[in-house]
């Protein structure tokens, strides 16, 4: 993206410089600086025709039908994001910061404080390599705007790296400002943070955040966020890479998952909790891998939703993520749902992989997996054409509940290596419009089993393992053309287009 002369003129007139912080010992760290950024670190252009505005979560469907008429985006659980101005389509030409580092520097036992509007406390630019040890960073502002510029480009983040390396060790970061992310890596920024406590209090204030291709590595953090659209682990337009090991990540606001993923994120040996939101949201061509983590979510009821979920993989076409396959992988650890169903995928291609996860279901346990179109009132795709194309692989996994699919979706369900499914597989055409040619193909290997709890419908069934009813009796397997493949002794029937055993 090229710099725009008009944008430069406008920004020169409106950007404010202010705040207080540690004075620099040399010009490498300028106090109360306004730093001009080149466009090299701007994210890739959004998909053609894809509008995009504000907050963690997208709104506008691919057919252009508007979502919220106020132009703001809202998270999937329907709790609207914060207010704030509409975002610009390219990175800002400059950032305000109290302590701006443009040359290599290491400092210890210092405090960096910011009180200015949309101002960072610490900013790393110009390829500098900066290390801060035993630090305190405080970002407080009553008039910061938040919104897209904070979500997409890091405006107003407490610690921001846009071009250079920032290493943070053994510190504390606190923010009380709209758009006050704890740590933000954007563009050519590369952040490494360890043994640090991060607390954010207002909206659009993620704990650790990447966008525009930024990179962030975190170890042994304690992160708490309290605002809306403030995921503890957050990413946004342009994505990036996050690698996280250990620590505790808690989000308390509505519309604030523990992890909001429009990037490639890997987390191991960490505790992840969303107290008023789904646990995980992944949009578009992005991935989340969890290993030996504890994960919990508690999505509130909301009239905009047609169901409640704990982990969602979807696509809104807002421009915040590239269209493509969303990937969720979880090995070991535990997953707890406090409300609604467990896994939901709609209006996207998606892939799930589960292995040895200890699952605690919500009291309602609405579904184990829902792979269907949607009637979400925000408009995720064209109604009747917004199904999912999903591959779900369970490896040495116990799982319970209903699996739902429809004729505008395609589901490949693979039970492998000793997996046990206790539940039913149902074709639910509620949100399928006039229908389509979607399929549900189930494969059960020789070591795996399906305990059937209700009459089920699939397109094809390959079973090298075992199928029994919850009543302990054999299950009838009947072709859609009336062919009797198996005459069971129990009350349950599986209807399938084809059967192989």
Range-by-range predicted roles:
Residues 15-19:
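C-terminal motif of bacterial Sec signal peptides marking the signal peptidase cleavage site
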Residues 1-11:
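Positively charged n-region of N-terminal signal peptides that target proteins for export
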Residues 104-109, 129-135, 166-170, 190-196, ...:
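All-beta strand scaffolds that present successive hydrophobic residues in beta-strands
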Residues 114, 139, 175-177, 200-202, ...:
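Residues in short coils/turns that link rungs of repeat/solenoid architectures in beta-rich domains
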Residues 406, 410-501:
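Extracellular beta-strand/loop-rich repeat segments of large surface/secreted proteins
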Residues 75-91, 136-162, 180-182, 186-187, ...:
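Acidic/polar low-complexity surface segments
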Residues 21-93, 317-319, 378-383:
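Disordered, low-complexity segments in secreted/periplasmic proteins that are enriched in proline
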Residues 81-144, 487, 491-501:
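N-terminal segments that cap or nucleate solenoid repeat domains
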